[in-house]
UniProtKB/Swiss-Prot annotation:
The keyword Nucleotide-binding does not apply. Its EC number is 2.3.1.16. The lineage of its organism: Bacteria, Pseudomonadati, Pseudomonadota, Gammaproteobacteria, Alteromonadales. Heterotetramer of two alpha chains (FadJ) and two beta chains (FadI). It is found in: Cytoplasm. It comes from Shewanella sp. (strain ANA-3). Belongs to the thiolase-like superfamily. Thiolase family. This is 3-ketoacyl-CoA thiolase. Pathway: Lipid metabolism; fatty acid beta-oxidation. The keyword Protein biosynthesis does not apply. InterPro entries: Ac-CoA_C-AcTrfase_FadI, Thiolase, Thiolase-like, Thiolase_AS, Thiolase_C, Thiolase_CS, Thiolase_N. GO terms for cellular component: cytosol. Its main location: cytoplasm.
Length: 436
């Protein structure tokens, strides 16, 4: 059996990435304060359809995701279909794979095209850290269920008497891993210590990311892949990411205190991604349908892979596990790639993965390979800046990476690119795209 992955339909046609778009990414409680993930999702899909001049009725499937769930609209994909002029019979379902969510939605649509079930679909993801599902305590939740069944006033009063003041306080969403109780920041600290990653190196990577992102915006390269978002009640708008440090000064990074390990830590707010709001989406088609409709795809999916590792120690190593699998399925080695886009959740996590890419020992002990994945050429790596600068709306990052690497390859005359990310739960995702 061949290790090569056939990302084609029964006719041998490739899976085309026809277009991609995102909202600007905004820090929590700024430009998108009060705007839900659903509203941002509808916003970006509407604009994507308008820009591509694609009849919404031609969309056969929409797969969309979010990480911070909205109890009022748990199937965000279906609500986007109903709110964007698509046919009401359009297949729509929602997915979640933590920070790799829109990698998953893209693969799901691609696989629907590969099997011949559809020829045109949309994938993406959105998250709001400003519109959060605020919960109640377990004791209050239990009491509310009992109240619903209580018949007499006396029974209801007895239920209320079981509650203390602290039981009435709202409960914010958990930021820790359910199975371990560790936050992503604590995991990044683990990784910094495990792989001896210095504070100076973390700050330097963050500075590089912000500097490149600022230069990219100034060059106009992102104009066609980032929409202008008009925010309800439509008296203001946001046209670019607002987390990027313009004129980033490396010396200023050293002034911040550690955020997670106050005494001995090195992970700070400056070398971590902030909580972010935003949405992104891509249009996928069979190669033949794209050609018939007159589109010039921005890229094609060559291979993809998902992996999982233990969550107790250094769980944000997903790229180091998913990338070699995607490369193997594409029949490639790291040095064959033209560009590499790796999600920068934290500088420590990014540097740890880069270190393990170059480690023969890691490859032998963890991957069963007789050679390292390869040393990353920094002239190919996150050349437009990364998540440390742009921000990270969890479910939107995957399709942001895919669109960004495809469009940059197009500007450079084509080639192959890797988009890869770590994710909570010890998950990893990688996708290799080819651009003509």
């Amino acid at each position: 059996m061949s290790d090569r992955q056939q990302v084609t339909n029964a006719k041998g046609e490739r899976i085309a990435i026809v277009a991609g778009l995102r909202t600007p990414f905004a820090k929590q409680a700024t430009a998108f304060h009060g705007v839900s993930a659903l509203d941002m999702g509808k916003m970006v899909v509407n604009e994507l359809l308008a820009r591509s001049e694609l009849d919404p009725k031609l969309i056969e499937q929409l797969v969309y995701g979010q990480v911070v769930q909205m109890p009022a609209a748990p199937n965000i994909a279906r609500e986007i279909v109903l709110g964007t002029g698509m046919d009401v019979s359009t297949d729509a379902y929602s997915v979640t794979r933590a920070c790799a969510t829109s990698f998953q939605s893209a693969v799901n649509v691609a696989e629907s095209i590969m099997t011949g079930n559809i020829e045109i679909g949309i994938a993406g993801g959105a998250d709001s850290s400003s519109v959060l599902p605020i919960g109640v305590s377990k004791k209050l939740a239990h009491a509310l269920v009992d109240l619903n069944k209580a018949r007499s006033f006396g029974q209801k009063l007895q239920i209320f008497r079981r509650l203390g003041i602290k039981d009435l306080l709202p409960v914010p969403p958990a930021v820790a891993e359910y199975s371990t109780g560790l936050s992503m920041g604590q995991t990044a600290e683990q990784m910094a210590k495990t792989y001896n990653i210095s504070r100076a190196d973390q700050d330097a990577l963050a500075h590089r990311s912000h500097t490149l992102a600022s230069e990219t915006w100034a060059s106009g390269h992102l104009r066609d892949e980032v929409m202008v978002a008009h925010v309800p009640p439509y008296k203001q708008f946001i046209e670019r990411d607002n987390n990027i440090r313009e004129n980033s000064d490396l010396s200023s990074y050293a002034k911040l205190r550690p955020a997670f390990d106050k005494k001995h830590g090195s992970v700070t707010a400056a070398n971590s991604t902030p909580l972010t709001d935003g949405a992104s989406a891509i249009i996928l088609m069979s190669e033949g349908r794209a050609k018939a409709l007159g589109y010039q795809p921005i890229g094609y999916i060559k291979s993809y892979a998902f992996t999982a590792i233990d969550v107790w120690q250094d769980m944000l190593m997903g790229p180091s596990y998913a990338t070699p699998l995607a490369l193997k399925r594409a029949g490639m080695e790291l040095e064959d790639l033209t560009l590499i886009e790796m999600h920068e959740a934290f500088a420590a996590q990014t540097l740890a993965n880069m270190q393990m890419f170059a480690s023969k020992k890691f490859a032998e002990e963890k991957l069963g390979r007789n050679r390292a994945i390869g040393e990353i050429d920094m002239s190919k790596f996150n050349v437009l800046g990364g998540s440390l600068a742009y921000g990270h709306p969890f479910a939107a990052t995957g399709t942001r990476l895919i669109t960004q690497v495809c469009r940059e390859l197009k500007r450079r005359g084509g080639g192959t690119g890797l988009a890869t990310a770590c994710a909570a739960g010890g998950l990893g995702a990688a996708m290799i795209v080819e651009v003509e």
